[in-house]
C-alpha cells in the first residue's frame, strides 16, 4: 500500500487546480527561456499565416506542460484538443482525432512516450506530410488509402525523453525542456493563488508554502488549498508562517518539501543498504512502488536537491541526505561527496 501523500503527488490531476492556471504567456511564471522562445515561434507562425511547428515538452510532472499547450492555442487563436498516449489504443483512435482537426489547430498528447508502436507509425506521415496512410481490409483485398489532413500543430509532453524513439523525437521542430521552479517563482505563484482564492497570505507564509512545494507549481497550488483549509478552521484571516508550518507539518511535508514516501526512500537506502549503491528494482520492491513512479516522481527532485546520485552501480545517498535524515554518514560517502568521485548514470 502506497504511503505517498496525494496532496503532493505531482502525478495526479485535480480539476480544481484549473482556476489557478495562467491564461497567457505573460501571466505564466517561470521557465523564462522557454517562454521567450515560444513567444518568438508563435509570433512568427502568425506572421507567416502557417501552423506552428510541432512542439515537445520534456520535464517532470506538474511543471506546466499542459498549461503551456493550452496557452499556445489561445495565443495562436486556434482550437485546442487534448488526449494522452495510453488513451490512443489503436491506429483508428488516432485517425479519428487527426481527421477532426481544423487548420492550424493544436493537438496535445500527454505521456507521448506511452504510444504503442503501431500508433506511432501512423503519426510519422501525419506530422511530416500531414497525411494519414491507412491499410483498409485484410489479405489480398487490403489496400492503402491516403487521407489529407489539415495542417496542425502537435504539442506533446513526456517525462521520459529516453523512451521516445529517434524517428519520433526528430520530428519535433521545437523541443523544450522544463525545469524545476525557484523558490522565488513559487512564492509569486502562491501569492497569486491566494489572491485568486481571496485568502490573505503574509510574505513569510507564502515563502513557507513555496519552500515545501518541491519546485513544482501544481504542488504549490495543492498545498496552498490545504493550508487555506487549516487557516479557515482556525479562524485566521491571513496565512502566516506559523499557520503554514503547522499545516504542512500535519500533512507530513518537511522543510525541504519531502513527504513520507521520499523519506522512506532515503531511509531504505540508508538503513538497509548503508547508503548504497543499490539498484532501482530493489528500491521499488522495498517501497512497493512501480519503478516508473520512482524514476518520474521521487528521484528527479531528490537528485536536483542534492540528496541522491545515480551511478553506474546504483543509487547512492549524498552527505546532504544523511544530514537531513539525522544519521551519521559513512566516511567514504563524505569523502566521495567532497571530491565528486561519483559519475552520473546516463
Swiss-Prot record:
Pfam families: AAA_lid_4, RuvB_C, RuvB_N. Residues 1-181 are annotated as: Large ATPase domain (RuvB-L). Keywords: ATP-binding, Cytoplasm, DNA damage, DNA recombination, DNA repair, DNA-binding, Hydrolase, Nucleotide-binding. It is an enzyme of class 3 (hydrolase). GO terms for molecular function: ATP binding; ATP hydrolysis activity; four-way junction DNA binding; four-way junction helicase activity. Its EC number is 3.6.4.-. DNA binds at residues 291, 310, 315. Residues 255-346 are annotated as: Head domain (RuvB-H). One of its GO terms (biological process) is DNA recombination. The RuvA-RuvB-RuvC complex processes Holliday junction (HJ) DNA during genetic recombination and DNA repair, while the RuvA-RuvB complex plays an important role in the rescue of blocked DNA replication forks via replication fork reversal (RFR). RuvA specifically binds to HJ cruciform DNA, conferring on it an open structure. The RuvB hexamer acts as an ATP-dependent pump, pulling dsDNA into and through the RuvAB complex. RuvB forms 2 homohexamers on either side of HJ DNA bound by 1 or 2 RuvA tetramers; 4 subunits per hexamer contact DNA at a time. The gene is ruvB. The keyword DNA damage applies. It catalyses: ATP + H2O = ADP + phosphate + H(+). Transmembrane segments: none annotated. Belongs to the RuvB family. GO terms for cellular component: cytoplasm; Holliday junction resolvase complex. Homohexamer. Forms an RuvA(8)-RuvB(12)-Holliday junction (HJ) complex. HJ DNA is sandwiched between 2 RuvA tetramers; dsDNA enters through RuvA and exits via RuvB. An RuvB hexamer assembles on each DNA strand where it exits the tetramer. Each RuvB hexamer is contacted by two RuvA subunits (via domain III) on 2 adjacent RuvB subunits; this complex drives branch migration. In the full resolvosome a probable DNA-RuvA(4)-RuvB(12)-RuvC(2) complex forms which resolves the HJ. It is found in: Cytoplasm. This is Holliday junction branch migration complex subunit RuvB. It comes from Brucella anthropi (strain ATCC 49188 / DSM 6882 / CCUG 24695 / JCM 21032 / LMG 3331 / NBRC 15819 / NCTC 12168 / Alc 37). Mg(2+) binds at residue 66. NCBIfam families: PRK00080.1 (NF000868), ruvB (TIGR00635). Residues 182-252 are annotated as: Small ATPAse domain (RuvB-S). ATP binds at residues 20-21, 62, 65-67, 128-130, 171, 181, 218. Has 3 domains, the large (RuvB-L) and small ATPase (RuvB-S) domains and the C-terminal head (RuvB-H) domain. The head domain binds DNA, while the ATPase domains jointly bind ATP, ADP or are empty depending on the state of the subunit in the translocation cycle. During a single DNA translocation step the structure of each domain remains the same, but their relative positions change.
